[in-house]
């Protein structure tokens, strides 16, 4: 994976990490993460697929696949603690 792609993925993780820190008991919507990470939904969805495949993020899509929620997995949370604290 090249550095540009990795930097983009870390940006999504950081945005999700910040959202989770601010609202720990509330699931993060795709719309909120798209806004916080400053990515169009189509780009965000592709990047989330890579993060899900890595085991760092869990994604739950609503019927139709347009809306949903995303959260850090245990390993994603551990990675976030290492990178962002």
Residue ranges and their predicted role:
Residues 14-21, 84:
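Short, locally clustered residues in the helix-turn-helix/winged-helix DNA-binding domain
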């Amino acid at each position: 994976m090249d550095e540009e792609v990795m930097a983009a993925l870390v940006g999504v993780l950081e945005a999700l990490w910040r959202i989770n820190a601010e609202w720990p008991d509330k699931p993060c919507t795709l719309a909120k993460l798209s806004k916080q990470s400053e990515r169009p939904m189509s780009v965000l969805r592709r990047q989330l697929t890579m993060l899900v495949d890595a085991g760092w993020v869990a994604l739950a899509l609503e019927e139709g696949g347009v809306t949903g929620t995303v959260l850090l997995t245990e390993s994603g949370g551990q990675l976030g603690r290492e990178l962002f604290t």
